Structures are given as C-alpha cells and as structure tokens.
From Swiss-Prot:
SUPFAM superfamilies: PhoU-like. Belongs to the UPF0111 family. It comes from the Archaea. InterPro entries: DUF47, PhoU-like_sf, Put_Phosphate_transp_reg. This is UPF0111 protein PH0637.
Length: 226
C-alpha cells in the first residue's frame, strides 16, 4: 500500500516519471544480457548461466513494477495524458525486458559451442551491442518526453525527442541488417540443423528487443501528436 501511494504521488507529479523508473530496470536487463552473450561467445557456460539468471531476476522486477504502476493509475488521477496511453506504452516498454529474457533462455540450451563458427558468434555479439543501444535510447526517449511535458511542449525539446526516436529507428534497421546477414550465413553453411535452429532463435529474440524498442518509439510519437 505504501509503495502504491509513492507511485500515485509520482504519477500526480508527472505521468512519465514512474515509466522512467521502469525503463531503468529494462536497461539493466538488456545490459546484463550483453554480459551473458559475452560469456556465451567465450564458451564460459557457467558464467553465462549466472548472468542469464540475473536477466530473469531483473525481468521479474520489471514485471513487478509494471503491475504496481498499472494498479496505481486510477481514473481519479489527473494527468495530461490518457490512462490507456500510459498503459499501452508501459506494456510495450516491458516487452523489451521480455525479449531479453527470451534470449537468455535460448543461450542456456546449448552448453558446448565448438560447432558454432566464430563469424556467427561475432554477428550475435554485434546484435547484442546494438540491442543495448536500443534499450538505452528508449530510456532517453521517455526521459525526454518528461522534459517535453515540463517545458510546455517547447519546440526545442520536441526536436530533441524526435532525434532520439530517429536514432532508435536507425538502430532497429541496423539490427535487421545483421539478422539478414546471419540468416544468409546459416543457410549457406554446413551447420547441423539443430545448431541452425538454435542460432536463428537467438537472433530472433535479440531482434525482438529492437523491434519492441521501435514500438515504444512509435508510441511516444503518437503521444507527442495528441
């Protein structure tokens, strides 16, 4: 009950400050996934397993915050944006952490990576680094949206927001390119079908991180135009 009152006070001050707190945990989740990926590429399964567990724990925290925020937003709260818009954005932002957790689960499936070529591992690592960028940009975007609101929708602050949104879209496009390159390598290589399926699912869940980041950026664009 005490925590719910805290969230309500934050929502009363600004509808975006609680979302910023949730975004912080989302970023931590993806950052931890990158550490898991580094250990995975080195063949350090036990260390990777530790980081994968932390990813799962952080995703649980993000889910808990999401539930608390959802329960705290009531129709009685006076906010400059619709309750449904806040909830839709929160849902999309939370999906970023979900995608990170899905990736971590796939990493755990295979212990020995001797059959996975280094060029494939390198692309997966690049996708991981770009995913971090996407998550951090989402965090910057929701913080900037708060600045836009506090400035009374000043043109200078709006331009900053659109710049961040464009950066998110660019990162998502870059990851799509890496994903396509990876698929080409997998289908032209002599990988065992199980290894191919394993790699493609890691790539798919990694791509979902940037896809969900782009979705949140689009939601921010909608909020800006309302």
């Amino acid at each position: 009950m005490i925590k719910m009152q805290v969230w309500k006070k934050l929502f009363a001050k600004s509808p975006f400050k609680p979302l910023i707190r949730h975004a912080e945990v989302v970023v931590q989740t993806v950052e931890t996934l990158e550490k898991a990926l580094d250990s995975w590429a080195r063949g350090d399964y036990e260390n990777m397993k530790e980081y994968a567990k932390k990813v799962d724990d952080l995703e649980d925290i993000a889910d808990k915050i999401k539930s608390e925020l959802r329960d705290s937003i009531t129709s009685k709260l006076l906010m400059p944006v619709q309750r449904t818009d806040i909830l839709e954005y929160l849902h999309m932002q939370d999906k970023i952490a979900d995608a990170a957790e899905d990736t971590a689960k796939w990493l755990l499936i295979k212990r020995n990576l001797d059959s996975i070529p280094n060029d494939i591992k390198d692309i997966i690592l690049k996708m991981g680094k770009e995913s971090i960028k996407a998550a951090k940009l989402v965090y910057e975007a929701i913080k900037q949206l708060d600045n836009v609101l506090e400035s009374g929708f000043a043109e200078k602050e709006i331009k900053k927001e659109y710049k961040i949104i464009k950066q998110i879209e660019e990162v998502e496009s870059k990851i799509d390119g890496l994903d396509s390159k990876l698929m080409e390598i997998v289908f032209t290589s002599e990988l065992d079908w199980k290894d191919g399926l394993y790699i493609l699912n890691i790539a798919r869940t990694l791509s979902n991180i940037s896809d969900k980041a782009k979705d949140t950026a689009e939601r921010i664009r909608v909020l800006m135009n309302k």
